[in-house]
Amino acid sequence: DASSFCQLPAVVGKCRGYFPRFYYNTEAGKCQQFIYGGCGGNRNNFETVEDCRATCHSH
């Protein structure tokens, strides 16, 4: 299921970069911003809130 990753938690990753990204927060029922370190993590990681909503908004 292509949208199952929308249920994954936000993961900063092991690198120390500072990249504002968006993830779908299942508890809040909406996309929220978090800081991504630049490597690792999971697919619940979008460059724009629009991409996040387009992929995960139906959950």
Swiss-Prot record:
GO molecular function, one term: serine-type endopeptidase inhibitor activity
BPTI/Kunitz inhibitor domain ranges (all copies): 6-56
Family matches, as Pfam families: Kunitz_BPTI
Keywords in alphabetical order: Disulfide bond, Ion channel impairing toxin, Nematocyst, Potassium channel impairing toxin, Protease inhibitor, Secreted, Serine protease inhibitor, Toxin
Coiled coil ranges: none
GO cellular component: a single term: extracellular space
SS bonds (residue pairs): C6-C56, C15-C39, C31-C52
Localization: Secreted; Nematocyst
Free-text function comment from the UniProt entry: Dual-function toxin that inhibits both the serine protease trypsin and voltage-gated potassium channels (Kv).
Family statement: Belongs to the venom Kunitz-type family. Sea anemone type 2 potassium channel toxin subfamily.
Protein's name according to its UniProt entry: PI-actitoxin-Aeq3b
